[in-house]
């Protein structure tokens, strides 16, 4: 029997890596499954900081499940097929642990599926450890905490669920870190954009959404200085246009998020800019506009785009 591969989404963020890493451990300890955690991309700088801090080896990167001899997969931090492994339609989805909308998803067989409207997939996995009476090792607690901090911007994002505060406190204690100090260090590690090329910058954290027949790419970068990112606008737009031509995106929306002041600048290019403007009730000026208080793609950008596109 081949191993069941456990992985997060393409262009993995910290929650994708952390939740899959922890769920792989839980699957073996609690459910007796023969699993292996892998990743659909290399860790970003924020995730690398967490991995190094807690002494965890990055999962190996794969592009195809069947190429690894696997016929079954478990998805964490995503469910939409266009965000998953290349041959997702050719293998059996054994299970899903996620905190996003469910869309573009169907299976031939019954599966284990747990989806909750909480701040991170890591939050769900942590509760599953408790429900099954499995002790959480320090390194796993640290990674789960990192996933939660990353996705909720240290519990400041509107996606933060009331239960996430207690989860963060408990994980910080298990990981033996100060929540605020470690959280800020983690987030700042992910804001070093100067060393990134424009192609890398628009792919750090990007997902594709099918909206009423349109392939809309929504990317996000975290920074402490929006103006510094906009200084590279011309080169960023060139990279976006190349990506649109190569991948067939109808529209590309880039969130440039200020993690200190909790605001974003939206840079958008594509065929449906009227729908983008209507979604956020703003007018793009030189392809960008300010979106006050917006820090969450999942709650403050994608639902609005979905409604505006009529998806």
UniProtKB/Swiss-Prot annotation:
Pfam families named among the record's database cross-references: DHH (PF01368), DHHA2 (PF02833)
Reaction catalysis annotation: diphosphate + H2O = 2 phosphate + H(+)
Signal peptide region: none
Keyword match Hydrolase: yes
Record's keyword terms, sorted: Cytoplasm, Hydrolase, Manganese, Metal-binding
Stored SMART domains: DHHA2
SUPFAM superfamilies listed in its UniProt record: DHH phosphoesterases
Family statement: Belongs to the PPase class C family.
Record protein name field: Probable manganese-dependent inorganic pyrophosphatase
Organism: Streptococcus pyogenes serotype M1
């Amino acid at each position: 029997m081949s191993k069941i591969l456990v992985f997060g989404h393409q262009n993995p963020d910290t929650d994708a890596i952390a939740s899959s890493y922890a769920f792989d451990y839980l699957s073996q300890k609690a459910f007796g499954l023969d699993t292996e955690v892998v990743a659909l991309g290399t860790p970003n700088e924020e995730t690398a900081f967490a991995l190094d801090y807690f002494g965890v080896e990055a999962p190996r990167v794969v592009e195809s499940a069947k190429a690894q001899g696997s016929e079954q997969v478990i998805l964490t931090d995503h469910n939409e097929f266009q965000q998953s492994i290349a041959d997702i339609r050719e293998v059996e989805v054994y299970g899903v642990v996620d905190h996003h909308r469910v869309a573009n998803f169907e299976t031939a067989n019954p599966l284990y599926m747990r989806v909750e409207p909480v701040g991170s997939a890591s939050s769900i996995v942590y509760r599953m450890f408790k429900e099954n009476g499995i002790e959480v090792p320090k390194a796993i607690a640290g990674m789960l905490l990192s996933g939660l901090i990353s996705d909720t911007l240290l519990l400041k994002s509107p996606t933060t669920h009331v239960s996430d505060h207690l989860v963060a406190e408990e994980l910080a204690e298990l990981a033996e870190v100060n929540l605020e100090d470690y959280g800020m260090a983690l987030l700042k590690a992910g804001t070093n954009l100067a060393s990134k090329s424009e192609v890398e910058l628009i792919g750090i954290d990007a997902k594709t959404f099918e909206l009423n027949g349109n392939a809309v790419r929504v990317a996000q970068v975290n920074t402490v200085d929006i103006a510094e990112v906009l200084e590279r606008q011309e080169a960023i737009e060139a990279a976006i246009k190349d990506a649109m031509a190569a991948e067939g995106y109808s529209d590309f929306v880039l969130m440039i998020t200020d993690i200190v002041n909790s605001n974003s600048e939206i840079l958008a290019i594509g065929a449906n800019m009227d729908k983008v403007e209507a979604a956020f009730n703003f007018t793009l000026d030189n392809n960008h506009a300010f979106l006050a208080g917006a820090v969450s793609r999942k709650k403050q950008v994608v639902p609005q785009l979905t409604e505006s596109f009529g998806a």
